[in-house]
Amino acid sequence: MKFNKEKLVIHACVLLFIIISIGLVFHRLQTKTNSIEPIHKETKLSDNAKYLVDRNKGKGEPSKLKEVYNSKDPKYKKIDRYLQNSLFNGSVAVYENGKLKMSKGYGYQDFEKGIKNTPNTMFLIGSAQKFSTGLLLKQLEEEHKININDPVSKYIPWFKTSKPIPLKDLMLHQSGLYKYKSSKDYKNLDQAVRAIQKRGIDPKKYKKHMYNDGNYLVLAKVIEEVTGKSYAENYYTKIGDPLKLQHSAFYDEKSFRKYFAKGYSYNSTGLSFLKPNVLEQYYGAGNIYMTPTDMGKLITQIQQYKLFSPKITNPLLHEFGTKQYPDEYRYGFYVKPTLNRLNGGLFGQVFTVYYNDKYVVVLALNVKGNNEVRIKHIYNDILKQNKPYNTKGVIVQ
């Protein structure tokens, strides 16, 4: 009898040990799983996508834009002849003294279907979208919701890096973050920014200028965190809707898709379509389509103080080499001696803008090529605008 009792006690102890061991192993696995924030976590629909779906419910196509061109004006006739003779494939818009003077398409929006470029054609603006992100950032500064000198981690607590990164360094492309590498695995902006944080800082590039899409993706995420709204909602409520940019849209807005240009490049077999495949992660740095007229409209309204006061606008658009704006680059665009410039290129499309107080020239092409050569010729040689415009070191009121 005594033997049986001892046997039962031993069996009970063994069973208890096994149960405790299994529990500990399960607890450790659970803790490990919870401590890792997955970069590639699947989501049904991002906040940006949800907002755009709701916004576009029942929405019809945008209004049609008419061609604007005066063949009796010698300078616009020269621009037209030059673009035709250079076999330009895209669209142009020129504003003079705040008024649209030329808006015309050349070549094809879709070669396979034979659809021609028109003033209604919308082009993927690529890095020119950083200008809009910069404007949103500037608005938050003026609303005292952010301080440009604060570290990113103040606004995105999990964005921890080996060295502090002020928002200003992201804006100026001197954060030192490793160059962003897009991946089909990243399904939204949040996953892209987590990947950027995980790669961290290149010590050799810290505090040195290195152009990097990743900087503006992180800024887009900061904008979302500070406002509690998606990047897309911020864009529309603070820029797109107030300034009536009705011919601009994010890549996944279905009601606009028939006007989206397809991007191409030439290879050994001829013209090849370049299908955009990572735009869901490019909020803030390259997933908006615009007509050249809408971009010109945006810039002219900024010049007319419809977004910021003169006190903010004039230094923003004219100063460089000053304490406030030591570099030519700021908020997604360049301030240079003879002009202001923004540019973007992605998936065979190039979108370039040159402007001063008199002219805004927007040139968009959808067959990969050198857009800079054409817009320089138009701005410098035809419109004769290669004169001093901004002066280094001069403070502008």
Curated annotation (Swiss-Prot):
GO CC term (a single one): plasma membrane
Keywords for the protein's UniProt record, in alphabetical order: Antibiotic resistance, Cell membrane, Cell wall biogenesis/degradation, Hydrolase, Membrane, Signal
Keyword Cytoplasm among record annotations: no
The reaction(s) this protein catalyses: [(4-D-Ala)-(2-GlcNAc)-Rib-ol-P]n-[Gro-P]m-beta-D-ManNAc-(1->4)-alpha-D-GlcNAc-P-peptidoglycan + n H2O = [(2-GlcNAc)-Rib-ol-P]n-[Gro-P]m-beta-D-ManNAc-(1->4)-alpha-D-GlcNAc-P-peptidoglycan + n D-alanine
Example GO molecular function: hydrolase activity
GO biological process, one term: response to antibiotic
UniProt subcellular location: Cell membrane
Gene3D superfamilies: DD-peptidase/beta-lactamase superfamily (3.40.710.10)
Membrane topology: Peripheral membrane protein
Domain of life assignment: Bacteria
Record EC number: 3.1.1.103
Coarse class of the protein's main subcellular location: membrane
Protein's UniProt keywords contain Chloroplast: no
PANTHER family hit by this protein: D-ALANYL-D-ALANINE-CARBOXYPEPTIDASE/ENDOPEPTIDASE AMPH, PENICILLIN-BINDING PROTEIN 4
Functional summary from the UniProt entry: Catalyzes the liberation of D-alanyl moieties present on wall teichoic acid (WTA) and lipoteichoic acid (LTA). Affects the methicillin resistance level and autolysis in the presence of Triton X-100 as well as the cell wall structure.
Protein's UniProt name: Teichoic acid D-alanine hydrolase
